């Protein structure tokens, strides 16, 4: 044992040294906005072209790995926090794990590009400057994603997935499974499973061109040691040019490294990344003022290339993160594990708001400047043990989680005033149909960068769970709970929020046979309660207890060998802050109640024909609103019905050729709580093709996709009295070679 321990420590030191050595290759001067350059020795590439051999075509891989379902688009296993890794048929929750094959073949560049394959997910993203979505009708953002099950260390603003092998989507709250999300998302959890070196050496180069004028280069390299114990995976990524939105440009440079080391009794991984991302002239949402809401019933009809983001706006971010995770088997029935991660984010952003005031298109433009440094530290420690009792096997888990945020921030909302007098940045009037913009540099004046400590947040929790399975494996019961503590210090207000909450969960799954599983669960989600800030409220200054979202869910899963399908029905309630119209007392209320029915399917029913998709029926309502004014109204931003159908078809007459199609449909949705402005239903079609062949024994794949094929001009409903104009028809072309 001592020898193995020394060997493990030595290998970890070697792995960490490799990480430190590799990462500087992609370091750049992000803070100054300039990219560092490096002079490399001359690299000679020697190749030999075959004289008379024709190009050899190849078919899609015929067999899938055991962890991927038929068709290769969905992984069988998911990582579910205290439940560990489990097959989807053995999980009493609705979870989908999108594979790297789907990510590559759909040319997905962001997390949203992947998760919109699920109809339970609605896109709230604003062009290239934000990553946001709804899961089962509740909002979540990039800040609430996990990396290998750990909150707080994923890039805070950047949603790229160059280093990601799988994107796991848990639908529904998950307080027991992974703790409270940093920003309090309760509708579901997105978990990134990072890439690992595979058994065979990998060197993949991908060149892409698309959107307006966007050029991308991506290098993916993986190697394992001779004994297979140590693996290294490196991803280098560069992206620059015009996006799908008018005048918007992006410039991204990123590097990632993933290490793993395995022995007979231990498994250790380390992931690190550094990202520089700049977006100029971003597209923004259209907001509706109270006056406009009184006069409008739908968003205005505008040209598909209309622009609501002002010229001269920008967002510059630098993200650095690292995650170390390790497991050690004390014996065959007891394992200890731990994880440690950190992230540092620098952000410098100037954005604008475009507020429509009248049906004639009269609008107002205002600006906001924000620069911040965000630091996060996250950790987890625990043990899992197996105990066999008469008739029932127990899998016990005890874990403790810790996360600490520090935010240094300066935010200026224009107009800027000194001694009550407007100095610069006064709101100006324009038109939604023919917008005229002010010159930002002269209009706003110099932007002052300073980052005083603004606030801190600490999340601590302890979770205990017992997974009980009958000896025949037919019944599994999950019983557990998490004690969550929330401490928030607002430096500017000189206030402290400190509350705690116990969150229980119960679940069961019954395997009727190898093909059918029935399940049910009750689980909660947690979010920080708010402070009463209304000075007229009798309880001014009080801190509301943490908000508790509660979910009841029932479902069935069917594994038919080549096709799998899941059906689930759920009800989620989530409170908010409400003011009593008579007493003026502020309390937790204003409940949102979402009830839904989900149907998902995936697989390869016939060789060469692959399917993914599903349907979602949602009844999302406001309840317990102030004075009952909006009781029964539909929750804004959520369609009653959504559907996604993705099809891939191999053309057997042309080896290596595959045609693809995806249809996305959303029914109408409201943008305001009073339900007076409705966005029309919309359907979007995406078509594509890929061709796989060999050149001199080198596998090559050419992919071409057209998004929004029919150039559909449509609005996407958001919350907070806003809508977003989607991009018109765009394309993406790429060539990948595996050496």
What does each of the following model-derived ranges do?
Residues 241-243, 258-329, 342-374, 419-450:
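Acidic/polar loop-and-plug regions of large Gram-negative outer-membrane beta-barrel proteins
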Residues 471-474, 571-573, 588-673, 734-738:
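Gram-negative outer-membrane beta-barrel transporters
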Residues 162-165, 175-255, 261-267, 320, ...:
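Outer-membrane beta-barrel translocator/receptor signature
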Residues 374, 393-405, 451-574, 604-606, ...:
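Structural signature of Gram-negative outer-membrane beta-barrels, strongest in the C-terminal barrel
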Residues 278-291, 404-409, 509-553, 558, ...:
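Surface-exposed extracellular loop regions of Gram-negative outer-membrane beta-barrel proteins
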Residues 6-7, 372, 395-396, 520, ...:
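Conserved C-terminal beta-signal and adjacent last beta-strands/turns
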Residues 327-329, 335-341, 345-351, 545-624, ...:
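Membrane-embedded beta-barrel scaffold of Gram-negative outer-membrane proteins
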């Amino acid at each position: 044992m001592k020898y193995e321990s020394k060997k493990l420590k030595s290998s970890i030191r070697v792995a960490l040294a490799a990480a430190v050595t590799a990462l500087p290759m992609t370091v750049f001067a992000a803070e100054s906005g300039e990219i560092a350059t490096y002079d490399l020795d001359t690299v000679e590439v020697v190749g030999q072209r075959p004289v008379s051999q024709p190009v050899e075509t190849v078919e899609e891989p015929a067999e899938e790995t055991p962890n991927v379902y038929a068709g290769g688009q969905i992984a069988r296993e998911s990582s579910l926090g205290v439940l560990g890794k489990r097959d989807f048929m053995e999980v009493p929750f609705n979870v989908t794990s999108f594979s790297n094959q789907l990510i590559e073949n759909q040319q997905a560049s962001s997390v949203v590009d992947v998760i919109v394959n699920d109809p339970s997910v609605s896109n709230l993203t604003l062009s290239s400057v934000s990553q946001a979505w709804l899961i089962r009708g509740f909002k979540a953002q990039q800040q609430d994603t996990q990396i290998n099950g750990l909150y707080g260390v994923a890039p805070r603003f950047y949603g790229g997935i160059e280093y990601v092998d799988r994107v796991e989507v848990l639908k529904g709250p998950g307080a027991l499974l992974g703790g409270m999300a940093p920003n309090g998302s309760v509708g579901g959890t997105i978990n990134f499973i990072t890439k690992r070196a595979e058994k065979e050496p990998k060197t993949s180069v991908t060149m892409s061109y698309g959107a307006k004028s966007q050029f991308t280069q991506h290098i993916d390299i993986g190697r394992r040691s001779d004994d297979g114990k140590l693996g290294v995976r490196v991803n280098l990524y560069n992206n620059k040019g015009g996006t799908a939105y008018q005048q918007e440009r992006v410039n991204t440079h990123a590097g990632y490294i993933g290490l793993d080391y395995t022995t007979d009794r231990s498994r250790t991984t380390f992931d690190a990344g550094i990202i520089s991302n700049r977006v100029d002239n971003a597209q923004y949402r259209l907001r509706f003022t109270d006056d406009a809401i009184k006069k409008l019933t739908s968003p205005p009809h505008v040209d598909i290339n209309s622009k609501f983001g002002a010229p001269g706006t920008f967002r510059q971010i630098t993200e650095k993160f690292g995650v170390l995770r390790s497991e050690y088997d004390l014996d065959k029935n007891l394992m200890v594990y731990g994880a440690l991660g950190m992230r540092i984010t620098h952000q410098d952003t100037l954005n604008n708001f475009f507020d429509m005031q009248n049906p004639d298109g009269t609008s107002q433009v205002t600006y906001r400047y924000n620069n911040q440094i965000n630091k996060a530290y996250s950790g987890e420690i625990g043990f899992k043990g197996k105990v066999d009792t008469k008739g029932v096997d127990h899998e016990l888990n005890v874990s403790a989680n810790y996360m600490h945020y520090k935010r240094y921030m300066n935010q200026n909302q224009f107009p800027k005033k000194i001694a009550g007098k407007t100095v610069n940045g006064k709101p100006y009037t324009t038109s939604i149909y023919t917008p005229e913009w002010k010159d930002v540099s002269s209009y706003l004046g110099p932007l002052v960068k300073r980052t005083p400590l603004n606030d801190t947040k600490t999340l601590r929790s302890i979770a205990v769970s017992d997974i009980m399975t009958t000896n025949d494996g037919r019944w599994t019961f999950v019983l557990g709970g998490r004690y969550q503590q929330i401490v928030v210090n607002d430096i500017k207000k000189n206030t402290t929020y400190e509350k705690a909450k116990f969150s229980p969960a119960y679940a069961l799954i019954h395997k009727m046979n190898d093909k059918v599983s029935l399940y049910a669960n009750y689980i909660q989600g947690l979010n920080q309660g708010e402070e009463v800030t209304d000075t007229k409220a009798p309880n001014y200054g009080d801190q509301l207890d943490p908000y508790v979202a509660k979910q009841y869910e029932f479902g069935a899963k069917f594994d038919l060998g080549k096709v799998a399908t899941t059906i689930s029905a759920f009800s989620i309630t989530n409170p908010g802050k409400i003011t009593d119209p008579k007493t003026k007392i502020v309390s937790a209320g204003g409940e949102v109640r979402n009830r839904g029915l989900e149907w998902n399917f995936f697989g390869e029913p016939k060789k060469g024909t692959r399917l993914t998709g599903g349907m979602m029926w949602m009844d999302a309502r406001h309840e317990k609103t102030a004075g009952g004014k909006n009781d029964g109204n539909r929750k804004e931003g959520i369609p009653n019905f959504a559907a996604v159908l993705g099809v891939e078809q191999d053309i057997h007459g042309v080896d290596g050729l595959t045609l693809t199609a995806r249809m996305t449909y959303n029914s109408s949705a409201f943008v305001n709580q009073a339900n007076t402005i409705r966005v029309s239903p919309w359907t979007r079609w995406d078509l594509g093709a890929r061709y796989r062949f060999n050149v001199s024994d080198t596998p090559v794949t050419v992919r071409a996709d057209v998004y929004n094929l029919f150039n559909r001009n449509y609005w996407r409903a958001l919350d907070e009295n806003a809508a977003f104009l989607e991009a018109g028809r765009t394309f993406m072309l790429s060539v990948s070679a595996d050496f």
